[in-house]
C-alpha cells in the first residue's frame, strides 16, 4: 500500500520588480537581432551581461565571446562585434575603427549617461571622483572616458577618509550604476562632509532598476528564513541584493545561478523564503527555482511588489527594422 507523504508548507515571497532591466533586455536583443540580420558569428566583447545562462544561450545561437578585439580572426573581420552593456573605454571603439571592424554598442543608456556626467565634470575643470568597485567593467569603462590622472576611484567611507585630492574645492562625483543605495549614500555623505564644495551629477547615477530591486528586497526580507537571489557571482547588482536582504532581516541570504546550486541539506526547517533576481538574471531561472521548491514543499507564492517598471530602451538604429519575436527571446523569458 502506498502512503502519501505530505510536503511541508512553505511561503515564497516573490519580489517584483526582479530580473532583467531595460538595459540588459536591450543588450541581449542587440546580439539576437545582429545574429538575425548579419548571420553567425557575431562577436561580443566581454560577457554581454554578467550571467552564464544568458551567455551560453547566445553562444548556442552563434555568438562568440572575446575579451579583446585582437581575438577576432581576420576572416571574420567583416562580421559585427557588440560591446557589452557595461560600457567600454574610449580606446575600444578607437581600436575597432583602426581594425576596420563594424561594431554595435550595447552600452546601457544609463551607463552612457554616467559617462556624459563624468565628461561634463572634466570639461568644467573638475577632478572626477568615481564611486564604484575596482575592476568592474563598468568602472573601467567610465574611467576610460577621461584622460589619465583626471579621475579617482573611491569604494568605501574609509577610502574617503584617506583621500587627499590636489584641489579639494574643485571635485565632482559620479557613481557606478549598480551599487548599494544605502552604502553609496554613506560614501557621498562623507565626501560632502570632507569636501563641502563637491559637485553632484545633474541626476542620480544609480539606475532605477538597481534602486527598485533593492527597495522591494528590503520590504520582503524581514521574517524570511532564507532569501535567494538569482544571479552570477560577478554580477555587482546581484551581490548587493544578497547584502540588502541580510541587512533587512533575512536569517540567511544566498546567491545562486541555477536551482541545482541550492544546498537542500543545509536549508533546515524553513517556513518563508524570499526570492529575487539580479538585473542580468533571466526569468526562466526564477521559474526553475520555484518549481524546485514545489517539488519538495507545498509552496504558495506571494508577490511582493513595489512598482511596475515600464522603461524600454531602443536598440541601435541599424537593427530597428529587424523583427524580434517572442520565440527569439524564449531562451531567457520562457515560452
From Swiss-Prot:
Tell me, what is an example of a GO biological process annotation in this record?
Answer: terpenoid biosynthetic process
Name the positions where dimethylallyl diphosphate binds: 50, 86, 136, 235-237, 280
Disulphide connectivity of cysteines: none
- Give the residues the record marks as binding isopentenyl diphosphate: 50, 86, 136, 235-237, 280
Report the cofactor remark: Binds 1 [4Fe-4S] cluster per subunit.
- Summarize where (2E)-4-hydroxy-3-methylbut-2-enyl diphosphate binds, as residue positions: 50, 86, 136, 177, 235-237, 280
Q: Which residues bind [4Fe-4S] cluster?
A: 21, 108, 207
Domain of life (superkingdom)? Bacteria
Question: Which cofactors must be present for this protein to function?
Answer: [4Fe-4S] cluster
- EC number(s) for this protein? 1.17.7.4
Q: Which UniProt keywords apply?
A: 4Fe-4S, Iron, Iron-sulfur, Isoprene biosynthesis, Metal-binding, Oxidoreductase
Q: Do you know which PANTHER family this protein is assigned to? A: 4-HYDROXY-3-METHYLBUT-2-ENYL DIPHOSPHATE REDUCTASE
NCBIfam families documented for this protein: ispH_lytB, PRK01045.1-4
Task: Spell out the protein name for this chain.
Answer: 4-hydroxy-3-methylbut-2-enyl diphosphate reductase
Organism of this sequence: Rhizobium rhizogenes (strain K84 / ATCC BAA-868) (Agrobacterium radiobacter)
Organism taxonomic ancestry: Bacteria, Pseudomonadati, Pseudomonadota, Alphaproteobacteria, Hyphomicrobiales
